[in-house]
Structure formats: structure tokens, C-alpha cells
């Protein structure tokens, strides 16, 4: 069966239209976008005299062939390998609920497969760590993650949808949340997650933290 991936791109908000056009030109749709920001601490930003700038997180479902096409295009056309340009990563999916949607993605994206295309052998070397925490806690969690080896992160604003009475380890599910995305090397994942767990247990905050495998990346100059 043709493999599918969640393809995530994080860029500056001011570059959003340019990258959207890139994806549409490469026949990738639909694209789901949300505003986010980098996880630099407020103290660091103040020290450097900077303001927290908005970013855009774009997500779409792509095939194996399209994933490699996008990775090459993002580097060649969009210069994603340049500093502060952005990052991209692919997370493998194990299933998709709708057979019709699955077939639509396959048919739309695999029309122009190169005749000599060979899927490279993949070795999982990166992980996407996701921590869902109460609003205002992402800076503190990112600080301990950095101390454990994380090089950066991205924060997305979110909100729980359960009733106000529902609690999860003392955290009201319906409260405003922050979702922290951290991409790390596989060998550093355990240290980072243990550091987050140790800090949150000590301070009584209990984010939901988990990790996903990352098969391909672009723009990670410090990690690749």
C-alpha cells in the first residue's frame, strides 16, 4: 500500500503566501494552516531586544513520492536551508479513515511519478515531541527541554473541548492550552521527555507529552 505522511512546514507569517503558492504549484491540497510562534523565552527575547514574531504552521497529507518532491523543492526553490527561513518534517501515518479520500490523494499526487523513481531506504533518526500544556507553561517547559538537549520549539495556541468538570491529572481539559512542538534527534528524545516529566511532577503541572517518528526533514541546519 502507498504510504502517507503528515507533512508539516513552519515558516514566518510574512512568508505564508509564498509557501502556500509553492504547495499549490506542486499539487498539494488541502493545506491546513494555523498561527504559531517560536518557543524562545520572554527573558531571551528581552535580552536581545526582540519581539515574539508570529509564524505559520502548515500541514497536509502527502504520498511518499510527493514527500521527496516537496523536500527537494523546499530546498531548491524556497531556500529552506538558509538561516531563519523555516523548517519542514514528515511524520508517517498508519491509517486514514476514508477510502475515498485516500484514493483521491493517491490519484492526485502520483500522476507524475518519475519513471526511475526509487524510494530511498529510511532510518528514523529524528523524533517530534509534542507537549500539550496549560496556557503560559510552554516557556518553562521549553527551558527544561533546552537544558536536556532540545535546540528549539514551536508553540500553537489551542483549547480543550471537554466539559468544565472534566479533569486530567489536575488539568482542566477545557482550559486554554499551548501545544509545544519540539524536533530532536532520536538519541536525545528520552532525555528531553524525562526532563519535562521531572519538572512537571515537581511543579504540579501535568502536560500530555508524547513523541512521533520523523522520517524526513528540511531546514534543520543544526540537527542534520
Feature names for model-found ranges:
Residues 1-224:
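Positively charged, small/polar-rich N-terminal and surface patches that mediate targeting and assembly
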Amino acid at each position: 500500500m502507498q504510504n502517507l505522511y503528515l507533512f508539516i512546514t513552519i515558516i514566518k507569517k510574512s512568508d505564508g503566501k509564498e509557501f502556500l503558492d509553492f504547495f499549490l504549484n506542486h499539487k498539494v491540497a488541502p493545506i491546513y494552516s494555523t498561527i504559531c510562534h517560536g518557543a524562545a523565552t520572554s527573558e531571551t527575547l528581552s535580552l536581545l531586544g526582540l519581539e515574539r514574531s508570529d509564524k505559520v504552521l502548515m500541514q497536509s497529507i502527502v504520498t511518499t513520492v510527493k514527500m521527496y518532491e516537496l523536500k527537494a523543492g523546499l530546498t531548491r526553490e524556497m531556500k529552506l536551508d538558509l538561516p531563519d527561513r523555516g523548517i519542514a518534517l514528515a511524520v508517517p501515518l498508519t491509517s486514514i479513515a476514508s477510502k475515498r479520500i485516500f484514493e483521491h490523494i493517491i490519484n492526485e499526487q502520483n500522476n507524475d511519478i518519475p519513471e526511475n523513481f526509487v524510494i530511498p531506504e529510511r532510518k528514523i533518526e529524528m523524533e517530534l515531541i509534542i507537549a500539550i500544556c496549560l496556557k503560559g507553561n510552554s516557556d518553562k517547559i521549553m527551558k527544561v527541554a533546552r537544558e536536556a538537549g532540545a535546540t528549539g520549539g514551536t508553540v500553537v495556541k489551542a483549547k480543550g473541548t471537554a466539559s468544565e468538570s472534566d479533569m486530567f491529572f489536575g488539568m482542566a481539559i477545557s482550559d486554554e492550552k499551548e501545544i509545544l512542538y519540539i524536533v530532536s534527534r532520536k538519541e536525545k528524545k528520552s532525555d528531553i521527555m524525562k526532563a519535562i516529566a521531572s519538572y512537571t511532577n515537581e511543579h504540579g503541572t501535568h502536560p500530555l507529552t508524547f513523541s512521533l517518528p520523523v522520517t524526513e526533514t528540511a531546514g534543520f541546519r543544526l540537527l542534520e
